[in-house]
Amino acid sequence: MKMSFRWYGESDPVSLQYIRQIPGVTHIVSAIYDEPVGEVWPAHKIEALKATIERAGLQFDVVESVPVHEDIKLGKPGRDRLIDHYRQTIRHLGAAGIRVVCYNFMPVFDWTRTELSKTLDDGSTCLAFSTDAVDRIDPNDGIALPGWDSSYRPEQLQALLADYRDVDENALWANLEYFLKAIIPVAEEAGVKMAIHPDDPPRPIFGLPRIVKNRDDLARIVRLVDSPANGLTLCSGSLGAGPENDVEALVREFGAMGRIHFAHIRNVKVDANGDFEETAHLSSCGSLDIAAIVKAYHDTGFTGYVRPDHGRMIWGETGKPGYGLYDRALGAVYLNGLWEALAKFDRAPQASQ
């Protein structure tokens, strides 16, 4: 298991120097943030980012993410040009030594929360989601969240939502299949593994289709193009926000297939209505058994990349909601501690014989 940490570039208040000081963190997950969605990422920018990260004593093997243009998801006539750009970006990333590319196929909205700083009993703040609050939101007013590939003006958002009125789940599946059949052969040649991220939360939002919600969706995706390069970012928090999803079982099933290329591990506390709040990583803090999930990775021989996902804001820290230093650092150390215990004590009985 290779422990990584997301970094938003030079504008990120969490510096590479601080990340380097987290015990056990060896890799950075980042992206090129100043290129318009749909354009080719220049090779020199990728190499410059890699050099910056390596100067800090860290490694850069995982990109999160290369955004997929809405015209590809919509299946518009201009998608072939955009897919060609995407394929060229994959080639550039592979040439720079990038091994995994995380991406998503969520229409319009990336991860969606209704609160970015909900106060918990201990005084920390977290990201939270309320179904009732979503029902009261008018998406035409414009919504922006940290980490999105773009923020839309109200008129742009209204036009996009209108375009998606004719796109149901079946159409979105067809457009994902078209996309994967075009990019996976290039990823294979470039030595890059594509890793689709689940819908977050794993349910329709604002009437838009969602097709990466559960076990059956994940199984269908890996069957669309049967290649080791067509895999998953298995996000415990995203999938765990769906009460029907058994995250440990998902890790065991798709881990045994070798299709989990990137793991996001975080905890959520989910109520009976499907509302949730993001908690500390510790199992007892949320609804997920993080120790059992990590054991599932260990048992299936996972050797890929892991990162602690969204954290609370604690100890007076300010910055990107969900992406502060302190709680994510605690999460990384907790996950590494679980892994070390499994690695050492799972083999202890055999060693004593």
Swiss-Prot record:
It comes from the Bacteria. GO terms for molecular function: ferrous iron binding; manganese ion binding; mannonate dehydratase activity. Its EC number is 4.2.1.8. Pathway: Carbohydrate metabolism; pentose and glucuronate interconversion. One of its GO terms (biological process) is D-glucuronate catabolic process. Keywords: Iron, Lyase, Manganese. Its cofactor is Fe(2+); Mn(2+). It catalyses: D-mannonate = 2-dehydro-3-deoxy-D-gluconate + H2O. The keyword Membrane does not apply. The keyword ATP-binding does not apply. It is an enzyme of class 4 (lyase). PANTHER family: MANNONATE DEHYDRATASE. Catalyzes the dehydration of D-mannonate. Belongs to the mannonate dehydratase family. This is Mannonate dehydratase.
